[in-house]
């Protein structure tokens, strides 16, 4: 790890000094004592790009990012530049370790990343899911709309439950005399005993299916498919999971795992710096969330991300995840 980054981690833990990057190209950085009177000044850049800023007075960390996509199934809210833009809404030119250090400097409490397996004996792993933990981090997004008007929203408003996937509802059998239409296509899976539907069900489509039968169980299954397939804003909150380190076998240097791009995730990754406090698959076909396209400004729009550690203890307050996607039976 670079010497300046090690210094930054030390600063974050001790709180004695801050690393100040000059805005003038070519000028050297300097580390100096920071009097309390100066901590209420402008946010302090923590990296040479000036994209990560420590705002002690506002008790927040600021990230200068930009929109990289608006129509994706998501693994993350924000990735590092030139890493995972194909499955993220925002991207930032920064090091994940700098973001980690900035959160520590604000006093944020690091938790533990998600765990999918545990080792019960040398070389033997068994499934053992543990969700990510850590201090809750409130995330807000600031940008200017096409009229130049400043906007600010909670980050959850840009993420919704995935809709372009299959939904299912248990049903032992079709009511007598019911023949499902081919258009719109509602499928009864005889083997798994469930109704299956793809995508967002429109009210008119729901009404077509409800007219097929007065059977209460069938109508309940249709209602469930309709409800679960509607675009629904993400409700889960983010926590400071903290990623981890590995030692490069060739260089013998420590490497921060989130430098692979997993900065602010909505799918659980052991390498995530920030992750959501609920089970959320990291497998492509089972991803739970997608971009809320109607709410996101155009690609390349500059967005200021606010990371605000919450003072209240982190409890098991995240709602259960939405139903897991599944494919049609063969």
Protein language model annotation of sequence segments:
Residues 3, 29-32, 326:
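Basic polycationic patches enriched in arginine
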Residues 7-9, 23, 36, 40-43:
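N-terminal low-complexity, Ser/Thr/acidic repeat segments characteristic of secreted
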Residues 15, 32, 37-38, 318:
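N-terminal compositionally biased, intrinsically disordered segments and leader/signal-like regions
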């Amino acid at each position: 790890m670079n010497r300046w980054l090690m210094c930054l981690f030390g600063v974050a833990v001790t709180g004695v000094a801050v690393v100040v990057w000059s805005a003038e190209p070519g000028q050297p950085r300097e580390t100096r004592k920071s009097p309390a009177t100066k901590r209420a000044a402008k946010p302090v850049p923590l990296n040479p790009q000036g994209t990560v800023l420590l705002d002690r007075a506002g008790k927040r960390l600021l990230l200068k990012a930009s929109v990289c996509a608006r129509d994706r199934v998501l693994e993350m809210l924000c990735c590092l530049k030139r890493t995972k833009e194909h499955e993220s809404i925002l991207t930032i030119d920064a090091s994940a370790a700098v973001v980690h250090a900035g959160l520590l400097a604000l006093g944020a409490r690091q938790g533990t990343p998600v765990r999918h397996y545990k080792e019960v004996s040398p070389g033997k792993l068994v499934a053992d899911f543990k969700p990510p933990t850590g201090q809750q981090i409130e995330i807000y997004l600031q940008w200017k709309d096409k009229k130049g008007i400043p906007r600010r929203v909670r980050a959850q408003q840009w993420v919704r439950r995935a809709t372009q996937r299959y939904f299912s509802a248990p049903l032992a059998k079709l009511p007598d005399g019911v023949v499902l239409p081919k258009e719109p296509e509602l499928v009864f899976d005889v083997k798994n005993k469930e109704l299956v539907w793809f995508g967002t069900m429109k009210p008119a489509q729901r009404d077509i299916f409800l007219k097929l039968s007065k059977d209460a169980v069938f109508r309940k299954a249709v209602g469930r498919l309709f409800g679960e397939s509607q675009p629904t804003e993400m409700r889960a909150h983010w926590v400071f999971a903290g990623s981890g380190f590995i030692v490069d076998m060739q260089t013998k240097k420590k490497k921060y795992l989130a430098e692979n791009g997993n900065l602010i995730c909505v799918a659980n990754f052991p390498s995530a710096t920030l992750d959501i406090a609920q089970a959320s698959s990291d497998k492509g076909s089972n991803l739970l969330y997608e971009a809320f396209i109607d709410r996101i400004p155009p690609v390349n729009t500059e967005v200021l991300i606010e990371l605000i550690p919450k003072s209240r203890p982190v409890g098991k307050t995240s709602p259960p995840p939405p139903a897991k996607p599944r494919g049609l039976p063969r």
